Amino acid sequence: MADTIHWADVIAEDVLKKSGKHLVATGITPSGNIHIGNMREVVTADAVYRALSNKGANADFIYIADNYDPLRKVYPFLPESYVEHVGKPISEIPCPCGNCANYAEHFLKPFLEALRRLGINPQVYRADEMYKTGKYTEAIKTALVKRDAIAKILEEVSGKTVAADWSPFNPRCNQCGKITTTKVTGFDLEAETVDYVCACGHSGIVPMAGGGKLTWRVDWPARWSVLGVTVEPFGKDHASKGGSYDTGKRIVREIFGHEPPYPIVYEWIMLGKQGAMSSSTGVVISISDMLEIIPPEVLRYLIIRTKPEKHIQFDPGQPLLTLVDEYERLRTQFRENDPSLGTFQKRVYELSRATGICQSEIPFKQMVTIYQVARGDFAQILKIVKRSGFSTEDKKCIKELADNVSKWLKLYAPPFAKFKVKEKVPVQAATLSELQRAFLSAFAALIESRGEISGEEYHMLVYSAKDEGSELNRKIAEKLNTHAPQVDPRELFKAIYFSLLGQKSGPKAGWFLSSFDKEFLVERFEEASNYSPEKQA
């Protein structure tokens, strides 16, 4: 795999076999929280757009918010009062929180902000505006005139019978506002109007511009024609035999006289053991919530590293740490120009990065330690970051990473990742062996005599205790009044964790120790080496 061409570049090369301007399009209906499963579509489109641009192609990238789609049902996250709005376009019903222009904007606004944070900047189209400004009017006329030809294509490709009163256009009732309960009874091409009757009992006339919308299987190919879409990713449900892409291919060619876009079919993102993400089933982590936990470049990496046709398993708990480790290791290899890094891996890193994304040098796991040692106090976090050898110049990015860690610890961190530094020597220190006490006292004296000590140096210093003749081994021997004691470093690390946390294990010791003021460690280890319950009574 190391020297394999990245999938985005393979797609770009295929697309460029056709000359001319290219338009990469993506579209999502903002009917609920837009989750990281949806995000796969947009990140995939962005990667291909960047690959095309890197090859000098004349290409643009757009995102279409399908906000003129109807509300299908009262979703679990909605109050029952929304039952009256089922069937209405989501751009025409109230915002759930009351702070946005409409229902669609309530979910669209955080999604567009998430795109910005991910370094994704497509031109944004809103379907309701496209319909209302007449962008679809000619396509609507064509579809109404060629209704029978479209119905024949739908039946031949999907294998389903089209109702005799079916129309490719769904008028919006002037009375109840719904587009799912109307039937077309006639149309006037010159006046650009459509006659309808509605199940609510009302009948009337609506303009083609904004008075309704094309049904999905006609809307999609009409969009390709109207906008000139040449590349589009979409979920595997649309790519099934007889599905909307199959019908769309024929409709766009035979009805609208345009070629279908290059298809990029993607698999689902599976959430832990809960299955594919879906807004309607509630198996979802919104992209906004996810960006409060995971650095943007890591979220891009999750999608960029995997071919679209393969499903992605995502778990925000312990596996998230493994994912972040992988990305940070790749970043280090890339920056150090590691000769073992292949073409594919280099490209994965390049496409995972984006302008405007924070690029913190601090490892996520290390910030997990720093944050908890500092008890979440940002001023203390900055002190520890500086003491750990990192620059504190970009406070915005440090704060962003600290906030990610804070939310992760609160919502998803497994118990072993959490700890609390005890304000006093923990009572568990009473169980320390004579060797462990001697080590703590010797270790305290040794680090007190030295200057600044890095995390790696702390780690190696503890391990040096097992080496006969090492300074730490000699000091332990002096404390025990013996010669070259046999030392198991694992017991020494336990002594450290018992002294600070009151538990036998904890975070990576080097990072952990380097997060503290040296004076605090010296005092704590000396106290722990002499601790007894009687003295505390």
UniProtKB/Swiss-Prot annotation:
The keyword Glycoprotein appears for this protein: no
The organism of origin for this protein: Methanosarcina barkeri (strain Fusaro / DSM 804)
PROSITE patterns tied to this protein: AA_TRNA_LIGASE_I (PS00178)
Catalytic activity: tRNA(Lys) + L-lysine + ATP = L-lysyl-tRNA(Lys) + AMP + diphosphate
Motif ('HIGH' region): 30-38
Lineage: superkingdom: Archaea
Subcellular location(s) per record: Cytoplasm
GO biological process entries: lysyl-tRNA aminoacylation
Tagged with keyword Ligase: yes
Protein name: Lysine--tRNA ligase
S-S bridge residues: none
Enzyme class: ligase
Primary site of residence: cytoplasm
GO molecular function, one term: lysine-tRNA ligase activity
Motif 'KMSKS' region per UniProt: ranges: 276-280
Family to which this protein belongs: Belongs to the class-I aminoacyl-tRNA synthetase family.
GO cellular component: cytoplasm
